[in-house]
């Protein structure tokens, strides 16, 4: 994860 809003931009970082 990055900060919280970046996970939304990056689906692969969502989980």
Curated annotation (Swiss-Prot):
<protein>
    <recommendedName>
        <fullName>NADP-dependent malic enzyme</fullName>
        <ecNumber>1.1.1.40</ecNumber>
    </recommendedName>
</protein>
<dbReference type="GO" id="GO:0004473">
    <property type="term" value="F:malate dehydrogenase (decarboxylating) (NADP+) activity"/>
</dbReference>
<dbReference type="GO" id="GO:0000287">
    <property type="term" value="F:magnesium ion binding"/>
</dbReference>
<dbReference type="GO" id="GO:0005737">
    <property type="term" value="C:cytoplasm"/>
</dbReference>
<keyword id="KW-0521">NADP</keyword>
<comment type="subunit">
    <text>Homotetramer.</text>
</comment>
<comment type="function">
    <text>Catalyzes the oxidative decarboxylation of (S)-malate in the presence of NADP (+) and divalent metal ions, and decarboxylation of oxaloacetate.</text>
</comment>
<dbReference type="GO" id="GO:0008948">
    <property type="term" value="F:oxaloacetate decarboxylase activity"/>
</dbReference>
<keyword id="KW-0963">Cytoplasm</keyword>
<dbReference type="GO" id="GO:0030145">
    <property type="term" value="F:manganese ion binding"/>
</dbReference>
<comment type="similarity">
    <text>Belongs to the malic enzymes family.</text>
</comment>
<keyword id="KW-0560">Oxidoreductase</keyword>
<dbReference type="GO" id="GO:0051289">
    <property type="term" value="P:protein homotetramerization"/>
</dbReference>
